Amino acid sequence: MSSRIARALALVVTLLHLTRLALSTCPAACHCPLEAPKCAPGVGLVRDGCGCCKVCAKQLNEDCSKTQPCDHTKGLECNFGASSTALKGICRAQSEGRPCEYNSRIYQNGESFQPNCKHQCTCIDGAVGCIPLCPQELSLPNLGCPNPRLVKVSGQCCEEWVCDEDSIKDPMEDQDGLLGKELGFDASEVELTRNNELIAVGKGSSLKRLPVFGMEPRILYNPLQGQKCIVQTTSWSQCSKTCGTGISTRVTNDNPECRLVKETRICEVRPCGQPVYSSLKKGKKCSKTKKSPEPVRFTYAGCLSVKKYRPKYCGSCVDGRCCTPQLTRTVKMRFRCEDGETFSKNVMMIQSCKCNYNCPHANEAAFPFYRLFNDIHKFRD
């Protein structure tokens, strides 16, 4: 009797194991929805573990599986614990990143939170990155909208643009004024930039620009919408890290919607393990530009570039000066992750470097600080 029960239990265990294996295997053919799913703010689309369909990436402490992978761009992986046959796990941070402190609260590396109704934030290795939940507040109003202003809406968190119809004026008249001295940068604009205010481009014009734009713009005409757009693009910011992989940003409205967006690119001024003074020639105080001795793969969020490159890096000085990129170009680079997921990112490639005493990394105030559509910024005390 006991042997019969033991055989029955063994059969049940075997069937359960085979069922779990069948569920964990990938289908012979992929069948995906026609439209990609819409994810919550701050949540990206990734391919499932079978490499078939785009799904919303699972976040820190959320349940995960082969068909519901974690967000690898935030350094998360699906932790199945000690079980080798488990089908579901929990998203955990791949490495012990630094926690974040914001508004007297501690957030773990990879944790997402909403500090207010206008921002969705994520802690990434000690830095808090946020995206706006009210993008309409940060985009340019319709150029045909006279005297645009933001007003609060009852029962809603986000403000909306309204137009005053009292005085309708052609926004593109007096182009000499638009491209004249009014585009200069003065000290009063620093406060406006900090408060995310826009400055009128020309006298009597409803066109606006960001205070940080100091160069002459060009005018783009959209024949489909019958609108003209003053196209403006800032220079790329300094790399966020003096060694290792960092991020460089710029702001532009060079798009069909004429909407201000922040563009990012991966940058690496120099490897963190690069020898400091060993390559200096006798009598020299600086080593400006150095080329990688052998082809290397770029890394981003735990993923490797598909191709190998021989990038140039900036050297170092012994007299207190710092070496920073002088001429750069941006290339589109393809990355592949361990789960087979591939994606493209803009990457900075250094062409030449310069050495001087202007070292902006010694002062955090030197970093550009914008809050725009699709923005990711760092909160500072």
Curated annotation (Swiss-Prot):
Keywords: Cell adhesion, Chemotaxis, Disulfide bond, Growth factor binding, Heparin-binding, Phosphoprotein, Secreted, Signal. This is CCN family member 1. Residues 98-164 form the VWFC domain. The keyword Disulfide bond applies. It holds the Pfam family IGFBP. The modification Phosphoserine is found at residue 188. Promotes cell proliferation, chemotaxis, angiogenesis and cell adhesion. Appears to play a role in wound healing by up-regulating, in skin fibroblasts, the expression of a number of genes involved in angiogenesis, inflammation and matrix remodeling including VEGA-A, VEGA-C, MMP1, MMP3, TIMP1, uPA, PAI-1 and integrins alpha-3 and alpha-5. CCN1-mediated gene regulation is dependent on heparin-binding. Down-regulates the expression of alpha-1 and alpha-2 subunits of collagen type-1. It comes from Pan troglodytes (Chimpanzee). Residues 286-360 form the CTCK domain. One of its GO terms (molecular function) is heparin binding. Interaction with integrins is heparin- and cell-type-dependent and promotes cell adhesion. SMART domains: CT, IB, TSP1, VWC. Residues 279-315 are annotated as: Heparin-binding. The gene is CCN1. Residues 228-273 form the TSP type-1 domain. Residues 1-24 form the signal peptide. GO terms for biological process: apoptotic process involved in heart morphogenesis; atrial septum morphogenesis; atrioventricular valve morphogenesis; cell adhesion; chemotaxis; chondroblast differentiation; chorio-allantoic fusion; extracellular matrix organization. GO terms for cellular component: extracellular matrix; extracellular space. SUPFAM superfamilies: FnI-like domain (SSF57603), Growth factor receptor domain (SSF57184), TSP-1 type 1 repeat (SSF82895). Residues 25-94 form the IGFBP N-terminal domain. The keyword Metal-binding does not apply.
